[in-house]
């Protein structure tokens, strides 16, 4: 799928926002792309979403903002861990060449 090395093992986090419904389905779909690229998915204490319909309303979503702060700390931790590992000789996992098959043979 394209240049698989570009995103390989780069921590990723999807965030979705909406007035009401639809954010969890969007978040699920975005995370699938990270999985295809072998990207560790960074999470928070809840799904990475906030609610608000107009400018300034997201700032009123206290739980959503807490989720974003936790997500930011978790992302920073993952990036620091990766950097420390690389600086101390922890090798990236060996990648296998992709094999493509049909579900039915």
Model-identified regions with their sequence ranges:
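Helix-loop-strand module that forms the ligand-binding subsite of alpha/beta enzymes
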Residues: 1-46
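Glycine-rich phosphate/pyrophosphate-binding loop and the adjoining helix
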Residues: 40-105
């Amino acid at each position: 799928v394209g240049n698989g090395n570009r995103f390989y093992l780069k921590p990723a986090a999807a965030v979705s926002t909406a007035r009401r419904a639809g954010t969890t389905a969007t978040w699920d779909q975005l995370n699938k792309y990270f999985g295809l690229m072998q990207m560790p998915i960074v999470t928070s204490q809840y799904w990475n979403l906030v609610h608000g319909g107009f400018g300034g309303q997201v700032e009123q979503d206290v739980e959503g903002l807490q989720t974003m702060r936790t997500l930011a700390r978790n992302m920073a931790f993952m990036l620091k861990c990766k950097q420390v590992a690389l600086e101390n000789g922890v090798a990236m996992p060996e990648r296998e060449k992709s094999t493509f098959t049909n579900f039915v043979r």
